[in-house]
Amino acid sequence: MEAGNRSGTPQHRQLSEIRQDLSSSPDTDAEEFRLLLLLFEQLPSFTLAAKDRSDVRLPDLGNLFLVWATECDSNSFDTDPSLPSFFALSLSNKETISYFTLPISRSIREIYLVNFTNALKNMYFSA
């Protein structure tokens, strides 16, 4: 799964400004969706892979966490290989902090952005 600049999108906003927007925005799905798109448009391109997480390079967004959906090797993790797995990655220290499975369709790819300083408020968009 990849996310990043969309063909030369200008870096017109600082990530700190977007982080502030996320914490102060009205609690509406449309606004959260718009702000998440802004955030991911400004991240450098990256690929999240279950077998090579040590090479993931992400900007430091303070205490924001990114959770992504990915296929999981059942030999490496105690999980049902028929389900997609979600890994929680700390953007501050690049450390995987947890993983879990959810019975969702493989055709649905979602990225969850979680701010643990805002009452575990989950925001997502479909990729």
Curated annotation (Swiss-Prot):
Residues 1-26 are annotated as: Disordered. Residues 1-13 have a biased composition (Polar residues). It comes from the Eukaryota. Partially overlaps HUL4. This is Putative uncharacterized protein YJR037W. The lineage of its organism: Eukaryota, Fungi, Dikarya, Ascomycota, Saccharomycotina.
